[in-house]
């Protein structure tokens, strides 16, 4: 009894011994957790009542620029006519701050993508503005080619993702449409940032797109990520938001997928709960809730209900909030979303799996957040990856 009281006393002292800044951070974490839990419960009730058009967004994907210095052969942003026709005009910094204020009214978690976000000269200032606006979780995806020039982005991020499809430098240069030597630089930068995760308190991820061109290479990429404490996120190559025909019939692909799912189940740092990766990589039909994670375009546009169905377009600087854009969408389009659940946008499948398996999603979130300390048995088991091929 006495020892128990001593332990409780130490825990209490530990919290109150925090300096003012750390204590405020802890309180913000608690506040965010409570707010997120309330929103999840509200959305769960709406979905169970078959009113998916009435949910509140939990995350937003912001394509901060359409400009890109890569020309990836599989990029859906280039191949999809519907996306290419969207106004590509980037907002200036002041307009971005106003847009971020609008987004923050409805969500505390923001994911930056593009295009290539680091092509914006003011990207660091934009991330600083997000912190000033009290965003909770900030993520950014980059091709990595400009990270050495803007390393300070990591100071403001919770998650930094680098796109890399193979360690074969010549092949990756060709797939990315860049000059020779670019991938060599990206791999070196990836290693450098992997070593900074603990110091700067962020999680590094590698995003890989699996296609006919690189299936055998993914095994080596997995080993590279696990060796350097990097989370790995993989998806199949898409065309018009659907998997390419080759992957649907490739035995080599499904053999790789089985291995990825096995590693996921064993606790390797593979991003995504098992159900997400199974749905995403096996192309299983799913129930989609696109309004949970809206996509916002460089000029502030939001497509209702999503970029696939694309029935209405609203500019958030004009509507003043995401909820108002949703309200107008419900009024003009109707509350029925008419989604067949056959596209494979990762954000939509994440939302679907989260709402259907919340405990598993929370467990996965904790695992990713603690991705720098996956267990020793997993480290020792890495050699088995090389034996699969």
Predicted regions: what is each one?
Residues 1-54, 299, 311-314, 324, ...:
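Radical SAM enzyme core and accessory elements
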Residues 10-11, 15-150, 158, 365, ...:
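Conserved alpha-helical substructure of the radical SAM core
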Residues 64, 68, 92, 130, ...:
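Generic structural signal for small/hydrophobic residues in well-ordered secondary structure
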Residues 81-85, 169-176, 241-246:
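A short acidic, helix-capping loop that chelates divalent metal ions and anchors anionic groups
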Residues 87-91, 177-182, 248-252:
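Alpha-helix N-cap and loop-to-helix initiation/capping positions
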């Amino acid at each position: 009894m006495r020892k128990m009281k001593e332990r409780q006393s130490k825990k209490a002292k530990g919290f109150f011994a925090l300096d003012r800044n750390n204590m405020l951070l802890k309180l913000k974490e608690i506040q965010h957790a409570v707010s997120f839990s309330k929103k999840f419960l509200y959305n769960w009730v709406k979905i169970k009542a078959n009113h998916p058009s009435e949910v509140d967004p939990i995350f937003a994907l912001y394509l901060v620029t359409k400009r890109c210095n890569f020309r990836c052969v599989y990029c859906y942003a280039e191949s999809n006519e519907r996306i290419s026709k969207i106004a590509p005009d980037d907002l200036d910094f002041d307009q971005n701050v106003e847009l971020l204020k609008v987004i923050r009214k409805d969500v505390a978690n923001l994911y930056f993508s593009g295009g290539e976000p680091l092509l914006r000269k003011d990207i660091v200032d934009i991330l600083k503005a997000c912190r000033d606006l009290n965003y909770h979780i900030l993520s950014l995806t980059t091709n990595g080619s400009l990270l050495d020039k803007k390393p300070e982005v990591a100071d403001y991020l919770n998650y930094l993702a680098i796109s890399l499809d193979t360690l074969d430098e010549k092949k990756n240069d060709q797939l990315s449409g860049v000059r020779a030597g670019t991938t060599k630089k990206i791999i070196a930068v990836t290693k450098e940032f992997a070593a900074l995760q603990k110091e700067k308190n962020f999680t590094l991820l590698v995003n890989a797109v699996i296609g006919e061109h690189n299936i055998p290479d993914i095994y080596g990429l997995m080993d590279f990520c696990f060796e350097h404490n990097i989370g790995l996120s993989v998806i199949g190559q898409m065309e018009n938001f659907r998997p390419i025909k080759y992957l649907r019939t490739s035995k080599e692909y499904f053999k790789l997928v089985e291995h990825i799912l096995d590693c996921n189940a064993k606790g390797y740092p593979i991003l995504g709960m098992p159900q997400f990766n199974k749905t995403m990589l096996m192309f299983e039909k799913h129930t989609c809730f696109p309004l949970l994670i809206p996509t916002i375009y460089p000029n502030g546009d939001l497509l209702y209900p999503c970029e696939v169905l694309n029935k209405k377009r609203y500019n958030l600087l004009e509507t003043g909030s995401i909820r108002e854009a949703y309200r107008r969408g419900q009024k003009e389009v109707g509350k029925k979303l008419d989604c067949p659940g056959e596209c494979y946008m990762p954000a939509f499948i994440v939302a679907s799996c989260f709402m259907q398996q919340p405990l598993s999603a929370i467990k996965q979130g904790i695992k990713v957040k603690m991705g720098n300390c996956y267990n020793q048995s997993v480290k020792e088991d890495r050699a088995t990856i090389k034996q699969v091929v």
